[in-house]
Amino acid sequence: MRLEAENLAGERGGETIFSHLSFTIGTGQALVVTGPNGSGKSTLLRIICGLLAPEAGEVKLTEGTQIVPVRAACHYLGHQNAMKPALSVRENLLFWQKFNGGEALDIGAALEAVDLAGVEHLPFGYLSTGQKRRVSIAKLLVSHRPLWIVDEPTAGLDKASEARFAELMREHMRQDGMIIAATHIPLGLDGAISTTGNGLVRSLDMAAFSVEDIA
């Protein structure tokens, strides 16, 4: 599987914030997107997964000679956790598992993977900020999608949870998954995966594509 972005431009509020942005990632690879606040990290991720239309350029996901819809192949984890506060943790994850299809881990195993065993019955709204984020990470595990697009995924996590998520990302890559992550802090991926195999972590600094710099 291969994801290509060619000459992308993105805008916010009618103003172009980045342009001439291109990259390619393949099976078992990750792209870590960095840059200052307002540089377009979140806008880029929303364009890639199809939530926003690009101002220019295109995004294409292929498997062999077949074009694959990105929305059908990706998990998107944004700033919001996209969970119903009144529903239990299990009910929320079950909804996303059925909605996304391609069942992977069962809900109990996914919660164990994020060190939240025993909270299935609790309303999501009862959880702490860090626990809510970990449940949202568990959403990535209960149904299989080859491409993870995650925006500040470690927001609200403690150091132990950050390390745990880094290992989940590495495992996803070892299983031929792809990751695009926007972050302002290290995610624990750089240098963690050998570049002699499929695993390869690349970085993209949005500041290099700002309209001010290009002008």
Swiss-Prot record:
Subunit comment: The complex is composed of two ATP-binding proteins (CcmA) and two transmembrane proteins (CcmB).
Localisation: Cell inner membrane
GO terms, biological process: cytochrome complex assembly
Annotated Gene Ontology cellular component terms: plasma membrane
Pfam families in the record: ABC_tran (PF00005)
Limits of the ABC transporter domain: 3-215
Natural source organism: Brucella melitensis biotype 1 (strain ATCC 23456 / CCUG 17765 / NCTC 10094 / 16M)
Taxonomic superkingdom: Bacteria
Membrane topology: Peripheral membrane protein
Record-linked PANTHER family: ABC TRANSPORTER I FAMILY MEMBER 1
Entry keywords, A to Z: ATP-binding, Cell inner membrane, Cell membrane, Cytochrome c-type biogenesis, Membrane, Nucleotide-binding, Translocase, Transport
Family, as annotated: Belongs to the ABC transporter superfamily. CcmA exporter (TC 3.A.1.107) family.
InterPro entries assigned to the protein according to its UniProt record, in alphabetical order: AAA+_ATPase, ABC_transporter-like_ATP-bd, ABC_transptr_haem_export_CcmA, P-loop_NTPase
Protein known as: Cytochrome c biogenesis ATP-binding export protein CcmA
Main subcellular location of this protein, as a coarse class: membrane
GO molecular function: ABC-type heme transporter activity; ATP binding; ATP hydrolysis activity
Entry's EC annotation: 7.6.2.5
Binding site for ATP: G35, P36, N37, G38, S39, G40, K41, S42
Swiss-Prot/TrEMBL catalytic activity: heme b(in) + ATP + H2O = heme b(out) + ADP + phosphate + H(+)
Task performed by this protein: Part of the ABC transporter complex CcmAB involved in the biogenesis of c-type cytochromes; once thought to export heme, this seems not to be the case, but its exact role is uncertain. Responsible for energy coupling to the transport system.
